[in-house]
UniProtKB/Swiss-Prot annotation:
One of its GO terms (cellular component) is plasma membrane-derived thylakoid membrane. PANTHER family: PHOTOSYSTEM II REACTION CENTER PSB28 PROTEIN, CHLOROPLASTIC, PTHR34963. It comes from Trichodesmium erythraeum (strain IMS101). Belongs to the Psb28 family. It is found in: Cellular thylakoid membrane. It is a peripheral membrane protein. Part of the photosystem II complex. It comes from the Bacteria. One of its GO terms (biological process) is photosynthesis. Its main location: membrane. Keywords: Membrane, Photosynthesis, Photosystem II, Thylakoid. This is Photosystem II reaction center Psb28 protein. Pfam families: Psb28 (PF03912).
Length: 113
């Protein structure tokens, strides 16, 4: 099963908006995953958010760069940033996203240039 967690052991049920950037050389890139009203920010959750864990059959990709965005003083969004510094990290992330998209019936839309 392919899943994303903010608290290890608790799968996030909200589907994120994913934004990708890539350097001209193709060797570096970033992925920003934005979750609106995620389970991890629910009132019944008492555990601490320790990172963003992207888990699939190959293993786990981890990012510690997670921020909450607030609306009217209440947590509304979680934003995870994953920085890819090599072509291998980019390819690994893309394999994760392919698997995640397939399991969650998601599509891919290329940005307009």
């Amino acid at each position: 099963m392919t899943t994303i967690q903010f608290i290890q052991g608790i799968d996030e049920e909200v589907t994120p908006e994913v934004r990708l950037t890539r350097s001209r050389s193709g060797n570096q890139g970033t992925a920003t995953l934005i979750f609106e009203d995620p389970k991890a920010l629910g009132q019944d959750v008492t555990q601490e958010i320790t990172g963003m864990y992207m888990i699939d059959e190959e293993g786990q990709i981890t990012s510690r760069d997670v921020k909450a965005r607030f609306v009217n003083g209440q947590p509304k969004f979680l934003e995870g940033l994953y920085v890819m510094k090599t072509k291998q990290e980019w390819e690994r992330f893309m394999r994760f996203m392919e698997s995640y998209a397939k399991e969650h019936d998601l599509g891919f839309k290329k940005a307009k240039a």
